[in-house]
Structure formats: C-alpha cells, structure tokens
Regions:
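Amphipathic alpha-helical dimerization/coiled-coil segments
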Residues: 1-16, 32-37, 84-115
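N-terminal helix-turn-helix DNA-binding core of bacterial DNA-binding proteins
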Residues: 17-21, 25-53, 75-87
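Canonical helix-turn-helix DNA-binding module
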Residues: 46-69
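Short beta-strand "wing" residues that participate in macromolecule-binding interfaces
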Residues: 72
Length: 115
C-alpha cells in the first residue's frame, strides 16, 4: 500500500502506470533531468522551469509520484523531488537508461518551436 504521500513500494510499482506516467513528454523531461543529476539529487518542482501553470505542474509531479518514479518530501514551503533510481532499476532494469537516451523532439521539448 502506498505511504501517506502516495509513494508506492517497489513491489507495488505497476509497469502500466509507470509507462502511462512516462507517456507525457514533460514528465519524461523531469525524469531525464533527474536521471542526469548525481544520485540522490533533490530539486524543487519550480527548478524544472516547466512552461505551465503551477496546478498543472503539481498534477504532473503527482502522476510521477504515484507511479513510483519520484520521491517527494516537504521542506518548509518547498517540495523536494528526487528520482527513485535504485528502486526503478531494481524493478524495471534498463527503463531509466531508455528514458535518459531519448532525444527530445522539438515539438515535445518546446511547444513554441512548432509555431
């Protein structure tokens, strides 16, 4: 059963839910940025500079958290986010490598590029 913050245990991580979370290009961008950082790096949600309303950003982070891809903890008035690298690699070997290797397309990396 997920903890009170909605983090599932590694055994509860569902491949379908993980793939659904990764289907969105903005969420993949968050995972790629966290995967590129040193192990255990924690960032605030605002540090990702996603071009969307705060409520939409919150939704995207909730989807990633409930899928088990990230761990979030409150720190004052900020919420720190870190990648659950060891748990993901243990449950779905190679998945993070595939996400990290993706080259974002201009239309998904920057919605304004298509205009």
């Amino acid at each position: 059963m997920p903890d009170k913050e909605g983090h599932p245990s590694p055994q509860e991580m569902d491949l379908g839910q993980v793939l659904a979370a990764l289907a969105d290009p903005w969420r993949r961008q968050v995972v790629r940025e966290l995967a590129a950082a040193p192990e255990g790096t924690a960032r605030t949600c605002a540090s990702f500079a996603l071009p969307m309303a705060k409520a939409t950003r919150t939704h995207h982070f909730r989807v990633l958290r409930e899928a088990g891809l990230i761990h979030q903890e409150d720190c004052g008035n900020a919420r720190l986010t870190r990648l659950r690298r060891a748990e993901i690699d243990g449950r779905f070997p190679g998945l993070l490598d595939l996400v990290a290797a993706e080259t974002p397309q201009p239309s998904t990396a920057d919605p304004q590029a298509a205009l």
